[in-house]
């Protein structure tokens, strides 16, 4: 088997598809409908949800199959009305109440700044948020403060690069993420790794003709990581 054939097979293995993707989709739909019910009755009506949004690697289509990354999760942003009038911990408590009510047989825990629900097929991280009148979003930074976020920015940039590289880029990103897990001991934060590679490949891919070329170029860029401290996981 040639190296390029091996890489093609690995890319297919890492991708979340088929039954696994369908189970995740059903879990998302179930959580969404249960939230509508939970926050639509009794005292919980006070905490009205105005928007729910999947973000993170699942929305970018760069999440690895759980067969290759046991820590794969789906990030779910929950935008509450007037959440800016509360500290993030209060909103996290609302989400924890929901999770414990509907998922009493699953592992539910707070892992700042999210509430984690560990289902059999996938882990969800519920992230409280609020949105301004101008559409600017803020998510929990810690228990007492909010931080600006714009998931669409990276999603759009990554989509452009992927289209410009004939859909090779995202497949390459998944391989690099797998390498970071298995050989690099998760040294690099997944989100920052994807951001770094997207920025680098925006204008530097014209000489890449095969999957191996893209990987070779990616590892060349990764050699610069030691000079870019914000991309290195300190924990």
Question: Model-found features: residue ranges?
Answer:
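N-terminal regions immediately upstream of nucleotidyltransferase
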Residues: 1-71, 84-87
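Extracytoplasmic/secreted envelope proteins and their assembly/folding machinery
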Residues: 25-28, 32, 92, 96, ...
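Catalytic cores of NTP-dependent nucleotidyl/adenyl transfer enzymes across multiple folds
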Residues: 29, 110-234
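Conserved catalytic core of two-metal-ion nucleotidyltransferases
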Residues: 35, 39-42, 47, 91-139
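Histidine-centered divalent-metal-coordination microenvironment in nucleic-acid enzymes
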Residues: 51, 59-62, 69-71, 75-77, ...
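Beta-hairpin (beta-strand-turn-beta-strand) motif
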Residues: 57, 81-83, 129-131
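A broadly used, surface-exposed interaction patch
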Residues: 65, 74-97
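Glycine-rich, often proline-containing surface loops adjacent to acidic residues and nearby aromatics
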Residues: 71-79, 151-157
């Amino acid at each position: 088997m040639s190296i390029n054939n091996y890489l093609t097979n690995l890319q297919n293995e890492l991708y979340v598809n088929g039954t696994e993707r369908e189970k995740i989709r059903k879990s998302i739909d179930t959580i969404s409908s249960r939230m509508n019910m939970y926050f639509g009755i009794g005292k919980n009506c006070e905490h009205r949800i105005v928007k729910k949004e999947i973000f993170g690697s699942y929305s970018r289509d760069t999440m690895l199959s759980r067969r290759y990354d046991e820590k794969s999760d789906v990030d779910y942003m929950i935008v509450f009305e007037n959440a800016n009038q509360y500290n993030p911990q209060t909103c996290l408590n609302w989400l924890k109440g929901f999770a414990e009510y509907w998922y009493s047989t699953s592992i539910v825990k707070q892992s700042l700044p999210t509430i984690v629900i560990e289902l059999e097929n996938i882990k969800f991280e519920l992230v409280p948020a609020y949105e301004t009148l101008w559409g600017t979003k803020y998510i929990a930074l810690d228990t007492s403060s909010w931080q600006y976020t714009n998931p669409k920015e990276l999603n759009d940039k990554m989509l452009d690069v992927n289209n410009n590289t004939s859909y090779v880029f995202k497949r390459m990103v998944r391989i690099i993420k797998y390498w970071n897990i298995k050989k690099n001991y998760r040294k690099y934060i997944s989100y920052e790794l994807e951001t770094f590679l997207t920025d680098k490949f925006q204008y530097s891919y014209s000489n890449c003709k095969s999957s191996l070329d893209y990987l070779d170029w990616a590892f060349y860029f990764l050699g610069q990581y030691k000079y870019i401290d914000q991309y290195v996981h300190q924990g």
